[in-house]
Each structure stands twice: as structure tokens, then as C-alpha cells.
């Protein structure tokens, strides 16, 4: 199998929310989804597809504390800005690792 989409979660979110091609064309506007739904798709739903939803995919007690820290909230920025949100750092197994 070959991946059919980018492995970049913010790009995946942006594509799902905006439905704009790299050439700027709108494709399937009726298939747009909300930023909230897109965020679930790249977090808990992705974990579910790997059968790891009990370990990762959401920030709750008992799960691994592995997640990306963003400089802006993808749920509150304009849909067109989602893909350009910068990564501040990560948290891996509870350890905060800012990008230098």
C-alpha cells in the first residue's frame, strides 16, 4: 500500500475544512467538514484506525502524554490559516520539548 494523503495533520485538516487544491480550485464544497471534525480525524479517529485509541489520540488520564503543541488554536483561526499554524514543540511521554 501507498499512502493516499499527506502525513502532515495540519495539511490534512486544512484540506478537509477548505477543499481547495494546490492550484486554488474548490473541489467538492459540499464535502467540507468543520475544524472540530477535522481535528478528531487526525487525533482520536486516527488512533482508532490503528487500534490504539486506548493509548493515544486524546489528552486524558491514563494515555501516553504524546502530542504536538501549536502556536495557535486550529479551532479558532480562520479555516484558510490552519495549514500555516506553526509548531511550538512537542510533549513526549510527559516531557516538554520546545523546538529550539
Residue map of PLM features:
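His/Asp/Glu-enriched, well-ordered alpha-helical/loop segment
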Residues: 1-76, 80, 85-93
Amino acid at each position: 500500500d501507498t499512502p493516499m494523503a499527506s502525513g502532515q495533520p495540519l495539511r490534512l485538516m486544512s484540506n478537509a475544512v477548505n477543499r481547495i487544491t494546490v492550484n486554488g480550485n474548490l473541489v467538492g464544497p459540499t464535502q467540507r467538514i468543520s475544524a472540530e471534525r477535522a481535528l478528531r480525524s487526525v487525533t482520536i479517529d486516527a488512533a482508532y484506525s490503528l487500534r490504539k485509541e486506548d493509548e493515544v489520540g486524546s489528552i486524558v488520564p491514563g494515555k501516553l502524554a504524546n502530542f504536538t503543541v501549536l502556536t495557535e488554536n486550529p479551532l479558532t483561526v480562520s479555516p484558510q490559516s490552519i495549514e500555516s499554524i506553526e509548531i511550538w514543540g512537542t510533549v513526549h511521554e510527559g516531557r516538554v520539548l520546545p523546538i529550539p
